[in-house]
UniProtKB/Swiss-Prot annotation:
Protein encoded by which gene: mcrA
E.C. designation(s): 1.5.3.-
PANTHER family for this protein: BINDING OXIDOREDUCTASE, PUTATIVE (AFU_ORTHOLOGUE AFUA_1G17690)-RELATED, FAD-BINDING PCMH-TYPE DOMAIN-CONTAINING PROTEIN
Keyword set includes Flavoprotein: yes
Domain FAD-binding PCMH-type span(s) in chain numbering: 27-195
GO terms for biological process, alphabetical: response to antibiotic
Pfam families: BBE, FAD_binding_4
GO MF: FAD binding; oxidoreductase activity
Name under which the protein is recorded: Mitomycin radical oxidase
């Protein structure tokens, strides 16, 4: 129904299902209302509606990162709020809540500037940013959240606030890394960088080369500069027409490269990797930065159900590689995908304006995505348990899933001191925990 709250869709109305369902449907739910907000005023009205009816509030743009069910909640879908504007002179962009990275790239590329986007151009930019944001320029420039200049959000009292380090230092600190626990962000101003091209793409190795490739990769990353970002995906591709023929229906080891220095230097750095086992497909090349989404070549719009887990690793030793190959390699028949991303570099450095993003001590992120089937989940958990000796004990919530919603799992994403501070900020701005349809940070029991 069209109301003072915008299009507040109820379960029996046309468009309700389309508005409530995201890309990853692991936490499918039936909200009391879905508000497809067209602007920030409708977001604020939706929060006031939730307050009036004493309902929790959730937010979704693309639905890549579900956490908990939004049953009986007010779910704000921001996909209509996709505005992007660029101030080339200041090297900044203003990004509305529902804009995807693809649209941001379309606006920044003509100015010779690049955002600190993620690997998929179809992910919502703001959701990525409030989770920290580990992208393909991160080893060079740091987490995307480190480069947020200002933001505008709706807090639990229904107020629209312009937030900077000067106006609300605690709130500004908490939102950059604290997800949507403190309010609904309707827009952000972020830094842009003078990166116009990348030497990047994928080396797709046959499954039988997995052990050789991973051992070589673990040594190779110890010597690369911060301009080099890389990751490795272990996956058994489906036998489908949209999968390139050399990769179709077989296990592959997909090594991704994104080098933001000179192409000749990138080619030199990648050469040892090209000398490894059978390469089925090589897409590494000099490319415009706007084509960065082709490097990981991730799925675009087909809905799926995946239980995602993430652990941060301090090292990738030979023993750790052997465990990954044994439990997730070509002979394991693992019913899940496994991805390693190289961290370090600027990720490890504190930002000029502090935020709560954790995991800065990690050398790698290990991500798994599994279908919700008991045996597959057990085998995935066995892999994660066997890697415990190399775990930092932390996690990255942008790579976490519906099984990581416990207080202990959320707390593991932050340092103990930062988590205590986050709970104090939560108690100040959302004492009733209205914003809890997420990886929840509960308010401190008392706050003064």
């Amino acid at each position: 129904m069209s109301t003072q709250w915008g299009w507040a869709l109820e379960p029996d109305q046309p468009g309700y299902d389309d508005a409530r369902l995201g890309l990853n449907r692991a936490a499918e739910s039936r909200p009391a209302y879905v508000v497809e907000a067209a602007d920030e005023q409708e977001v604020a009205a939706a929060v006031r509606l939730a307050a009036e009816q004493k309902r929790p509030v959730g937010v979704m743009a693309t639905g890549h990162g579900p956490s908990v069910s939004a049953d009986d909640a007010v779910l704000v879908n921001t996909r209509r709020m996709e505005g992007v504007s660029v101030d080339a002179a200041r090297a900044t962009a203003w990004i509305e809540a529902g804009a995807r990275w693809r649209k941001v790239l379309e606006h920044t590329a003509p100015h010779g500037l690049a955002p600190l986007n993620g690997s998929s151009p179809n992910v919502g930019a703001v959701g990525y940013l409030v989770g920290g944001g580990a992208g393909l320029l991160g080893r060079r420039f740091g987490y995307a959240a480190d480069h947020v200049r200002r933001l505008r959000l709706v807090t639990a009292d229904g107020r629209l606030r312009d937030v900077t380090a000067g106006t609300d230092p605690d709130l500004f600190w908490a939102v950059r890394g604290g997800k949507d626990n403190f309010g609904l962000v309707v827009g952000m101003e972020v830094d842009l960088f003078p990166v116009t091209r990348l030497y990047g793409g994928g080396l797709y190795f046959a499954g039988e080369a997995t052990a050789e490739v991973l051992h070589a990769y673990a040594e190779w990353v110890r010597h690369v500069p911060e301009e080099m970002a890389s990751s490795v995906l272990l996956v058994h591709n489906p036998d489908l027409p949209d999968v390139p023929e050399p990769l179709r229906g077989r296990f592959i080891t997909h090594l991704r490269i994104a080098y933001s220095g000179e192409p000749a230097d990138g080619e030199h750095l990648v050469r040892p990797l090209r000398e490894l086992g059978p390469i089925l497909l090589d897409t590494v090349r000099d490319m415009p930065y706007a084509e960065v989404g082709t490097i990981h070549h991730e799925p675009t719009s087909m809905p799926y159900v995946a239980y995602d887990r993430n652990v941060l690793l301090s090292d990738l030793t030979d023993d750790a590689v052997d465990i990954i190959v044994a439990l997730a390699g070509p002979d394991a028949g693992a019913p899940f995908v496994t991805e390693l991303r190289h961290f370090g570099g600027a990720y490890a450095r504190p930002p000029k304006v502090p935020n709560c993003v954790g995991g800065r001590d990690a050398a790698f992120s290990l991500f798994t995505g599994a279908v919700p089937e008991a045996e597959g989940l057990r085998r995935r958990d066995d892999l994660l348990d066997r890697l415990r000796p190399w775990s930092t004990g932390g996690t990255n919530l942008n790579f976490a899933g519906v099984e990581d919603i416990s207080p202990a799992s959320v707390e593991a994403a932050y340092t103990p001191a930062d988590f205590a501070r986050l709970r104090a900020v939560k108690a100040q701005y959302d004492p009733d925990n209205m914003f809890r349809v997420n990886f929840n940070i509960p308010p401190a029991e008392s706050w003064t």
